[in-house]
Amino acid sequence: MKLLMLIVALMIIGVQSKDGYPMDHKGCKISCVINNKYCETECVTVLKGKKGYCYFWKLACYCEGLPNWAKVWDRATNKCRA
């Protein structure tokens, strides 16, 4: 029974969070070079996510565990006018 409750709890947590690149006011990814502290602040403090770091190869912040209301960058709906 405890295992079943654990599985249900994990499924609920997974449904209520998302991962992705947070966007600035222009609809662009938040850029970074190697500054994990900045990305951690943006993702955790501002957007109420669980974790944030600078994804080096993309030169952009990446957030994990964001609430569903947080806007994340999507290639299909990209409106970035950098």
From Swiss-Prot:
GO CC terms of this entry: extracellular region
Domain LCN-type CS-alpha/beta span(s) in chain numbering: 18-81
InterPro entries (UniProt xref): LCN-type_CS_alpha_beta_dom, Scorpion_toxin-like, Scorpion_toxin-like_sf, Scorpion_toxinL, Scorpion_toxinL/defensin
Cystine pairings recorded for this chain: 28-80, 32-54, 39-61, 43-63
Keyword Signal annotated: yes
Principal location class: secreted
UniProt KW keywords: Disulfide bond, Ion channel impairing toxin, Neurotoxin, Secreted, Signal, Toxin, Voltage-gated sodium channel impairing toxin
Gene Ontology biological process: defense response
Tissues and organs where the protein is expressed, per its UniProt entry: Expressed by the venom gland.
Record-stated family: Belongs to the long (4 C-C) scorpion toxin superfamily. Sodium channel inhibitor family. Beta subfamily.
Protein name: Beta-neurotoxin Css9
Organism: Centruroides suffusus (Durango bark scorpion)
